[in-house]
From Swiss-Prot:
PROSITE patterns: RIBOSOMAL_L24. GO terms for cellular component: ribonucleoprotein complex; ribosome. This is Large ribosomal subunit protein uL24. Belongs to the universal ribosomal protein uL24 family. InterPro entries: KOW, Rib_uL2_dom2, Ribosomal_uL24, Ribosomal_uL24_CS, Ribosomal_uL24_KOW, Translation_prot_SH3-like_sf.
Amino acid sequence: MAAKIRQNDEVIVLAGKDKGKRGKVTKVLPNGKVVVEGINIITKHEKPVPALGKAGGLVKKEAAIDASNVAIFNPETNKADRVGFRFEDGKKVRFFKSNEKTI
């Protein structure tokens, strides 16, 4: 099945502590989660690894968020939108449901 949200899509968060924030999808995970730039920041405590020259400490990084909690952002309407699929010239393409524009 084709993915409705793909890497480099601009999305808006629908639920959770970052509700209403926008960001670019940096990674799509196979378990139905996405990593969004600047969203769902966690603080991870890392141990130092002298053999690799890694310093320990607190590291802030982006955690995965469920794909159902984000929606693709439509720049023309400035709102979250739904995604549909159709065939154009024998290729399957995604389009915004609100204004039928190809993504």
